[in-house]
């Protein structure tokens, strides 16, 4: 039964990536300045990209939805990696789903043990990048430039930590 469930999850992941990734173009953002934005988080606070970049070397912007299987599989790995790098890396996960209300998102965060910032993509930032695949993850450096774009889920903590290590390698630690 466990093997069948694993096979089913892999097939759902492959199908989702194949179908949703076909029209996505957020990769065009690589190397460009990401527009500043403010989003209300489920904790009631405002998350502003430019403010976060004043205290972090990198900001991870993750577009997702509660119904997205690959998104759900990726989150525990992102959470664990973020906990390790929280002093230098910030995370904002923005749901693109209109029905993902604050109550739904709070429940989801509790269920998955997520403690990084979570909000809704009410400004349709993913749409403005002509993206329609989730999860889509962009990483912005301290200058506001997009230094990484990934369409699809990361399936291990190591994928995140290796990426963070490579991006942080050339950034001096400010004490």
Q: Language-model segments: what does each one mean?
A:
Residues 60-61, 91, 137:
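Hydrophobic beta-strand anchors of alpha/beta hydrolase catalytic cores
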Residues 1-8:
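Bacterial N-terminal signal peptides that target proteins for export
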Residues 72-112, 123-128:
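Structural microenvironment flanking redox-active thiols in thiol-disulfide oxidoreductases
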Residues 38-59:
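A short beta-strand-turn-helix
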Residues 107-115, 120-168:
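Thiol/disulfide oxidoreductase modules built on the thioredoxin-like
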Residues 8-16:
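Bacterial N-terminal signal peptides
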Residues 15-36, 53-55:
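N-proximal helix/coil linker or "cap" segments that precede and/or mark the start of modular domains
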Residues 56-59, 63-67, 133:
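Short pre-active-site segment immediately N-terminal to redox-active cysteine/selenocysteine motifs
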